[in-house]
C-alpha cells in the first residue's frame, strides 16, 4: 500500500476516534527523549496481543511499534528524540511472537507496515504521518495533551 493511502487511512482512524486504548490518558514522561526497549511483558502474558497492545498504549503517552532494521521507524523515533519526548518503542522483530503482534496491529489500524505510532491513546499513523504532524506543529500539542491528562489523573 502506498504512503499516501496509508496516511489517508491513518487520518480517517484518528478523525473517527475508532482507535483508542483503554483510558485515553496515558502515562509517560518527557525526559531523555530516548525510547524504552521492549519489556519481557511482550509475548509472555496470557492476555491476547490486542490486550497487550492496548495496555501498552494506555500506559504510555507515545508508543512506536517498530522493527530494528526499519529506516522509517528510525525516522519516527528521531522526531520524538529531537523533541525531547520520551516514547515506548516495541521492536516487533525482537519478539518471539512479533508476527502475532503485527497481525493484531494490522487489525487495529488497517495496515501491517511499521512503524505504527500511537500518541495519547490514539493511532496517528506511520512515519510520514508523524513527520507531517510535526511539520504542521500539531505533534507536540498531542503529546502535551497526554501529559496534562496524566497530571490531572495524579491529582485525583
Curated annotation (Swiss-Prot):
<keyword id="KW-0411">Iron-sulfur</keyword>
<dbReference type="Pfam" id="PF00462">
    <property type="entry name" value="Glutaredoxin"/>
</dbReference>
<dbReference type="GO" id="GO:0051537">
    <property type="term" value="F:2 iron, 2 sulfur cluster binding"/>
</dbReference>
<feature type="domain" description="Glutaredoxin">
    <location>
        <begin position="50"/>
        <end position="150"/>
    </location>
</feature>
<keyword id="KW-0539">Nucleus</keyword>
<comment type="similarity">
    <text>Belongs to the glutaredoxin family.</text>
</comment>
<dbReference type="GO" id="GO:0015035">
    <property type="term" value="F:protein-disulfide reductase activity"/>
</dbReference>
<feature type="binding site">
    <location>
        <position position="67"/>
    </location>
    <ligand>
        <name>glutathione</name>
    </ligand>
</feature>
<dbReference type="InterPro" id="IPR014025">
    <property type="entry name" value="Glutaredoxin_subgr"/>
</dbReference>
<keyword id="KW-0479">Metal-binding</keyword>
<dbReference type="GO" id="GO:0046872">
    <property type="term" value="F:metal ion binding"/>
</dbReference>
<dbReference type="InterPro" id="IPR011899">
    <property type="entry name" value="Glutaredoxin_euk/vir"/>
</dbReference>
<dbReference type="GO" id="GO:0005739">
    <property type="term" value="C:mitochondrion"/>
</dbReference>
<keyword id="KW-0408">Iron</keyword>
<dbReference type="InterPro" id="IPR036249">
    <property type="entry name" value="Thioredoxin-like_sf"/>
</dbReference>
<feature type="transit peptide" description="Mitochondrion">
    <location>
        <begin position="1"/>
        <end position="19"/>
    </location>
</feature>
<dbReference type="GO" id="GO:0005634">
    <property type="term" value="C:nucleus"/>
</dbReference>
<feature type="binding site" description="in inactive form">
    <location>
        <position position="61"/>
    </location>
    <ligand>
        <name>[2Fe-2S] cluster</name>
    </ligand>
</feature>
<keyword id="KW-0496">Mitochondrion</keyword>
<keyword id="KW-0813">Transport</keyword>
<keyword id="KW-1015">Disulfide bond</keyword>
<keyword id="KW-0318">Glutathionylation</keyword>
<keyword id="KW-0676">Redox-active center</keyword>
<feature type="disulfide bond" description="Redox-active; alternate">
    <location>
        <begin position="70"/>
        <end position="73"/>
    </location>
</feature>
<keyword id="KW-0001">2Fe-2S</keyword>
<comment type="function">
    <text>Glutathione-dependent oxidoreductase that facilitates the maintenance of mitochondrial redox homeostasis upon induction of apoptosis by oxidative stress. Involved in response to hydrogen peroxide and regulation of apoptosis caused by oxidative stress. Acts as a very efficient catalyst of monothiol reactions because of its high affinity for protein glutathione-mixed disulfides. Can receive electrons not only from glutathione (GSH), but also from thioredoxin reductase supporting both monothiol and dithiol reactions.</text>
</comment>
<feature type="binding site">
    <location>
        <position position="114"/>
    </location>
    <ligand>
        <name>glutathione</name>
    </ligand>
</feature>
<keyword id="KW-0809">Transit peptide</keyword>
<comment type="subunit">
    <text>Monomer; active form. Homodimer; inactive form. The homodimer is probably linked by 1 2Fe-2S cluster.</text>
</comment>
<feature type="binding site">
    <location>
        <position position="102"/>
    </location>
    <ligand>
        <name>glutathione</name>
    </ligand>
</feature>
<protein>
    <recommendedName>
        <fullName>Glutaredoxin-2, mitochondrial</fullName>
    </recommendedName>
</protein>
<dbReference type="InterPro" id="IPR002109">
    <property type="entry name" value="Glutaredoxin"/>
</dbReference>
<keyword id="KW-0249">Electron transport</keyword>
<feature type="binding site" description="in inactive form">
    <location>
        <position position="146"/>
    </location>
    <ligand>
        <name>[2Fe-2S] cluster</name>
    </ligand>
</feature>
<feature type="modified residue" description="S-glutathionyl cysteine; alternate">
    <location>
        <position position="70"/>
    </location>
</feature>
Amino acid at each position: 500500500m502506498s504512503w499516501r493511502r496509508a496516511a489517508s487511512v491513518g487520518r480517517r482512524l484518528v478523525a473517527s476516534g475508532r482507535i483508542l486504548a483503554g483510558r485515553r490518558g496515558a502515562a509517560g514522561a518527557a525526559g531523555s527523549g530516548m525510547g524504552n526497549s521492549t519489556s519481557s511483558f511482550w509475548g509472555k502474558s496470557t492476555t491476547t496481543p490486542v490486550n497487550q497492545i492496548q495496555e501498552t498504549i494506555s500506559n504510555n503517552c507515545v508508543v512506536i511499534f517498530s522493527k530494528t532494521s526499519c529506516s522509517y521507524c528510525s525516522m519516527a523515533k528521531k522526531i520524538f528524540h529531537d523533541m525531547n519526548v520520551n516514547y515506548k518503542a516495541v521492536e516487533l522483530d525482537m519478539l518471539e511472537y512479533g508476527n502475532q503482534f503485527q497481525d493484531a496491529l494490522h487489525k487495529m489500524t488497517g495496515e501491517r507496515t511499521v512503524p505504527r505510532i500511537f500518541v495519547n491513546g490514539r493511532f496517528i499513523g506511520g512515519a510520514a504521518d508523524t513527520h507531517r504532524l510535526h511539520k504542521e506543529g500539531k505533534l507536540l500539542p498531542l503529546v502535551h495533551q497526554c501529559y496534562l491528562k496524566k497530571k490531572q489523573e495524579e491529582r485525583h
